[in-house]
Regions:
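Short amphipathic alpha-helical surface patches that mediate protein-protein
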Residues: 80, 160, 211-214
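Surface-exposed patches in mature extracellular/periplasmic domains of secreted proteins
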Residues: 39-43, 62-74, 168, 204-211, ...
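Short alpha-helical scaffold segments that flank and stabilize functional sites
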Residues: 65-66, 191, 195, 215
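An exposure/low-complexity boundary signal
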Residues: 72-88, 228, 232, 322-342
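PPIase-associated folding chaperone regions across multiple families
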Residues: 4-6, 33-44, 106-201, 235-342
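N-terminal targeting/tethering segments
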Residues: 2-125, 283-292, 304-307
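Ligand-binding pocket segment of bilobal, Venus flytrap-like solute-binding proteins
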Residues: 197-233
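Secretory-pathway/luminal and periplasmic proteins that interact with or process carbohydrate-rich
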Residues: 83-93, 165-169, 185, 216-224
Length: 342
């Protein structure tokens, strides 16, 4: 099998000679299977993936020929954004490594391999290529992509088709303070108590607490909107009973300092919002300016631009896919034989 993995499938030579092997295709296939929960891929889909890899190399080589590149820090940002979005908070690579180790007992590299089928370095190389492709295609089609936008009819039709999903649950605006336990539970409890006493003495001190240099290092403090849902309770590390108890409180209520598995925290109820169905002109979240109409316009525009971008990338790669730039080493039955792995 190791010998077969080294078999070359195609060579892209627009700017330099790069060979795509069976092993590289297997890695990409594994990535797709992990992303979509698939046990295996049919040969036709593997062939399509091979064509995608050829297209990617054509565009990245064309970009290199024109002097386009991305920095390691841009790649690292894209890498961390992938996980920060999942976690709901910005993390460094060291913090991510520590978090993964605590939650799964695995190293970051092991976790990424399980999650994507790629090693960390392979995953970063994949992200780097995607960033270069985005940059190159956008440089060629910027005005056309930016001109793509949702129409009023598309927005209103989308609202009518999804009207039942635009609702407010019962919600509250809270001032929430969380002090991580770290290695000293007593010190964390003492800090949480001090911050609560400061707020209790003068609720305007919340701005001082939020703007302190300690916020984000020794503790986390801020205003959040909490919905009366099981998912929200899980995100906060609260029981359903605690969340229901919260929604029984009135604006102005200040909780005691409570302990969770990872921190000490307290909250103050700032405002309450009743559940309701949203019209197309209502704001999506309390105390924001984005309406349902704005939200749909942005999402539909983004979807249309993404679709246009994909088509533009395919068009560009097709124009570059000529015999002098690509040599397909295996075709027909010979290719299918190499792709017949489970």
């Amino acid at each position: 099998f190791a010998q077969a993995d080294l078999q070359p499938l195609a060579t892209v030579k627009l700017n330099k000679s790069e060979t795509i092997t069976v092993k590289q295709l297997k890695t990409r296939a594994s990535f797709i299977q992990k992303q979509y929960g698939m046990e295996s891929l049919p040969i036709e889909q593997k062939q399509a993936l091979l064509e995608n890899l050829i297209a990617e190399k054509l565009i990245t080589q064309a970009a290199a020929k024109e002097g386009l590149s991305v920095t390691d820090s841009q790649v690292d940002d894209a890498f961390l954004n992938t996980f920060s979005q999942q976690l709901g908070t910005r993390v460094s690579e060291a913090q991510l490594e520590d978090l993964i180790k605590k939650q799964t007992g695995k190293s970051l590299d092991e976790y990424i391999k399980e999650y994507s089928g790629m090693s960390k370095s392979e995953y970063k190389a994949y992200l780097k290529n995607q960033l270069i492709i985005q940059q190159y295609v956008f440089s060629k089609k910027q005005s056309e992509i930016q001109a793509v936008a949702a129409t009023d009819e598309e927005i209103r039709n989308a609202y009518e088709m999804n009207k039942s999903t635009f609702v407010w649950n019962d919600m509250m605006k809270l001032f929430l303070v969380m002090v991580p336990k770290g290695s000293n539970d007593m010190a964390a409890r003492a800090l949480a108590t001090d911050l609560r006493n400061k707020y209790k003495g003068d609720s305007k001190k919340s701005e001082e607490i939020k703007n302190s240099n300690e916020n984000g290092t020794n503790y986390r403090a801020g205003d959040i909107t909490v919905a009366k849902t099981a998912q929200q309770a899980q995100q906060l590390g609260w029981s359903i009973d605690k969340l229901n108890e919260l929604f029984g409180k009135s604006a102005g209520y200040l909780s005691e300092v409570t302990e969770t598995a990872s921190d000490f925290q307290f909250y103050a109820v700032l405002k309450k919002y009743d559940a309701k169905m949203l019209s197309i002109s209502d704001v999506v979240q309390p105390e924001t300016t984005v309406t349902v109409y704005d939200y749909l316009k942005r999402n539909i525009t983004s979807q249309k631009q993404s679709q246009y971008f994909t088509e533009a990338a395919q068009e560009i790669s097709k124009s570059l896919d000529i015999p002098s730039n690509v040599e397909r080493k295996k075709t027909g039955d010979a290719l299918k034989k190499l792709l017949n792995w489970q």
